Amino acid sequence: MNGTEGPYFYIPMLNTTGVVRSPYEYPQYYLVNPAAYAVLGAYMFFLILVGFPINFLTLYVTIEHKKLRTPLNYILLNLAVADLFMVFGGFTTTIYTSMHGYFVLGRLGCNVEGFSATLGGEIALWSLVVLAIERWVVVCKPISNFRFGENHAIMGVAFTWFMAAACAVPPLFGWSRYIPEGMQCSCGIDYYTRAEGFNNESFVIYMFTCHFCIPLMVVFFCYGRLVCAVKEAAAAQQESETTQRAEREVTRMVIIMVVSFLVSWVPYASVAWYIFTHQGSEFGPLFMTIPAFFAKSSSIYNPMIYICMNKQFRHCMITTLCCGKNPFEEEEGASSTASKTEASSVSSSSVSPA
């Protein structure tokens, strides 16, 4: 083994010189230059500085404007709630620990930070699954006369939290565990050890199969069918140009959200799987730290995509920020009318396959 295993931690360094210490009790400056912890803290501060306002604004604007409270937007709001959960439960913890150079908050803090990051990431993934299924059902119409309504959206939100909890809760009760990883100032699932009594191997296989591979397969299937349906409908000109444009805009927005999720989380998942399948192999602290903290940036992607690509929401947001007036009223209003992306309009006038 090319690391040092201790009670509830694994340091990616052999303790041949006796410098390795518990990441709950001592600064880990022997792993990397102390300046790296300052950079990490600054990065987390940036994510908090951007992530909190943009996700809070998404929630506030939707509550402020009744016309935005559509079934599809319930799922998008669920993403914002998950991101805020990560900001408060994970980012604030990590910025504090990185300032000290070790996980000063102890085992309880490690569980809170690891749970928050895992739950937020899983809610985001399963929300994208629900969005993909919604797009597939609305556009491809595998169920005739089906309309995605408020009850379906509420069930979809409840489903995302249930599935996310099924992944994030078990390590709190002994099926695997959360331990410090990388530079030892953030926590994640124990991919590193075969510690007795925790069944890490079975949990990691369960997590990768049921909470990563299967949801991604569902997403790819739905969008594969959706792309074919949109092309067929466009060729047959079965729907009006306005309807087709609205469908394309909503679909494009959700696809970009999926791509941004993959860009954020696949590097982390790939490195975690490599470490799990090569336990005991040599790797440095940055090997896991960089993809782990890159994945955390996903908390600012989805609301930015939503704001940039949903013209109606952007119009309402500007109105809210400018005290009820939109200085770009003519441009935003015209665009919003021409290509409305409300779920209600999407559901009632959807593109069907030829």
Swiss-Prot record:
Span list, region Disordered: 329-354
> Which InterPro entries does its entry note?
GPCR_opsins (IPR050125), GPCR_Rhodpsn (IPR000276), GPCR_Rhodpsn_7TM (IPR017452), Opsin (IPR001760), Retinal_BS (IPR027430), Rhodopsin (IPR000732), Rhodopsin_N (IPR019477)
Which GO-annotated molecular functions does the record name?
Answer: 11-cis retinal binding; G protein-coupled photoreceptor activity
Q: Where is the lipid attached (S-palmitoyl cysteine)?
A: C322, C323
> Can you summarize the PTM annotation of this record?
Phosphorylated on some or all of the serine and threonine residues present in the C-terminal region.
Question: What is a biological process (GO) this protein takes part in?
Answer: absorption of visible light
Its GO CC terms are: membrane; photoreceptor disc membrane; plasma membrane
Where is the protein situated, by its record's location annotation? Membrane; Cell projection, Cilium, Photoreceptor outer segment
Question: A Pfam family in this protein?
Answer: Rhodopsin_N
- Please list the residue ranges that the record marks as compositionally biased, kind Low complexity: 334-354
User: Carbohydrate attachment sites?
Assistant: N2, N15, N200
Task: From the Swiss-Prot or TrEMBL record, give the protein name.
Answer: Rhodopsin
What organism is this sequence from? Atherina boyeri
Starting at the broadest rank, the lineage of the source organism is: Eukaryota, Metazoa, Chordata, Craniata, Vertebrata
Tell me the gene name. Answer: rho
